[in-house]
């Protein structure tokens, strides 16, 4: 990834960075909750974004 990025690419990377986090613990505590973990987590070395 180059140090000179377009704004569009930068926005895209920022969104992916925000998506790549675990679910909050209070969501797991909710009644009737079936979500255990964030299944859409992405590891930087294993799965690339396809840019």
Curated annotation (Swiss-Prot):
- Keyword Ribosomal protein belongs to the record: yes
Q: Which Gene3D superfamilies match?
A: Ribosomal protein L39e
Q: Name one GO biological process term.
A: translation
Matching entries from InterPro entries are given as: Ribosomal_eL39, Ribosomal_eL39_dom_sf
Give the superkingdom in one word: Eukaryota
- Return the GO cellular component terms, semicolon-separated: cytosolic large ribosomal subunit
Q: Per its record, what are the GO molecular function terms?
A: structural constituent of ribosome
**Pfam families listed in its UniProt record:** Ribosomal_L39 (PF00832)
Coiled-coil regions, chain positions: none
Print the keywords alphabetically: Ribonucleoprotein, Ribosomal protein
Q: Which family does it belong to?
A: Belongs to the eukaryotic ribosomal protein eL39 family.
Instruction: Give the protein name, as stated in the record.
Output: Putative ribosomal protein eL39-like 5
